[in-house]
Amino acid sequence: MTQWAMTESLEDRRRLVRVARGLEEGDLLVRGARVAQPVTREILEADVLIADGRVAVLGGTGDGLQAARVVEARGAFLAPGFIDGHVHIESSLLTPAGFARAVLLRGTTGVVAEPHEVVNVLGPQGLEWMLEAGRRSGLRVWASAPSCAPASGFEAGGARVGTAEVRQMLGQPGVLGLAEMMNYPGVLGGDEEVWAVIQAGRATGRRLDGHAAGVRGRDLQAYAAAGLHSDHEATTPEEARERLRAGLWLMVREGSAARNLQALLPVLRERPRRAMLVSDDVSVDELLELGHLDRLLRACVAGGLDPLDALALVTCNPAEYWGLHDVGLIAPGHLADFVLLRDLQSFEVLETFVGGAEAQPGELTPPLSGGGVHLGQGWDAATFEVPPGWPVLGIHAEQITTSREPEGSGDARLIVADRYGRGEWSACWTAGSGLTGGTLGISVLHDAHHAAFLGGSDTDVRMAGRALEALGGGLVVVSDGEVRASLPLPFAGLMTGEAPQEAAAGLARVTAATRALGCTLPYPVTTLSFLGLTVIPSLKLTPRGLLDVEAWQLVPSR
């Protein structure tokens, strides 16, 4: 099975040179391809000779290249394998093996995972598991070391990541840098622990990923001056250009929870040098129905980008940003990660190759202990009253930001309960979901991953909580004292070991049951999962209370 890190001896390189010189035959010859080279913005009619998992020769057709096996491209386009430079695999509800099964056939050959979901639950053990599971997946899985777990000091997760834990994770093979620094108030305010984490990342000489939602003007300049290198939170062309001018790499996010590509296409048409496409958080049903990075490429070309410029956003650009010098190009010495495409408009994938072999998704996922749901003994008698004077949390479809609505305008309660046994919970009113009865309960609540419940009577909420405990974490819909649908997520309460199709079917049942209760959100589970993320404006709910993100304080009751 191809792993993200190929062991390579000096003799392997010497053989590669001998094959390149024509002194030995290669292992694989892809003949008659049209090679798309984003870095030079040209398409070459060429044959590609491969040895020991790497490109030996990019030659003209008819050069007499020899190999033990030949694949006839018959004029198909051959492009570098796609790289997602920022993705939370856990948000797909799949393990790395399941995620690989969903994306390899869509042309994705590598991802930079940001595993702060599982790290929030289990600490550095979660990152180690993600890398090991990635090595077994058939997909190249690199990682960045989570910098904020939990995302802020307004809540506590299953684990707390401090400077010592960050240093430990940065030392893991396959970790490319520091993950998104979400605590921008701590960066700007000089928080000692935040700056110690930044310094731990700086000491490695690697990338320091940014996360600066809503930060503009002098504050953005100050954030960049702290040494952060990127941001994926731009939602308007003005924000995107401001980040590029500040020297930040622009990660254009298009996932299931936040969709920014259409808004930022005008900037991408200007061909910015330091930009890439990322999915961030994408659900399993969307992966299967719409695709992964191939879907984003189609949208870019339909929006006026040259296909080669679009390809650069998912190949050479993310590889350059992360210092992945062996991928992202079709060139001698580079890993033979490539995709055969029918054309450069639909980006229909004919075949995906990783390390010079047809992509084979892995079957095995290592075990992962811990991370269930523990609501405490007081849960069975709990009542969920909203404190007087609290504003209503406005929910907006396909966005992870919320709004502040006037008291009395709410239509469904939101309850967030600590799932790690501390016995804490709080409730607020929401507006915008359309939910008229019953409860949707989940154990996937960014980023500390407490249990969240939208709508319903106290009885339904309590029942949904106990159902989540019995599942070991997951998704559940309860109405009139009955469980209407559920999906177990036994891996840290975040992921299922089922195949993507089975996971998508389970998610579809939960979504259908939620819509039967009046919910109008296109992706109710995904939207609910971001209503507790304490570093995204405007209001977010934690087990300890309602947070005003802009004011950076809990909302007092009247």
Swiss-Prot record:
Q: Which Gene3D superfamilies match?
A: Metal-dependent hydrolases, Urease, subunit C, domain 1
The record's family statement is: Belongs to the metallo-dependent hydrolases superfamily. Adenine deaminase family.
Reaction catalyzed: adenine + H2O + H(+) = hypoxanthine + NH4(+)
Species of the source: Deinococcus deserti (strain DSM 17065 / CIP 109153 / LMG 22923 / VCD115)
One GO term in the molecular function aspect is: adenine deaminase activity
A Pfam family the protein falls into = Adenine_deam_C
Query: Which InterPro entries does the protein's record reference?
Result: Adenine_deam, Adenine_deam_C, Amidohydro-rel, Metal-dep_hydrolase_composite, Metal_Hydrolase
Q: Which EC numbers does the record give?
A: 3.5.4.2
Q: What cofactor does this protein call for? A: Mn(2+)
Q: What is this protein called?
A: Adenine deaminase
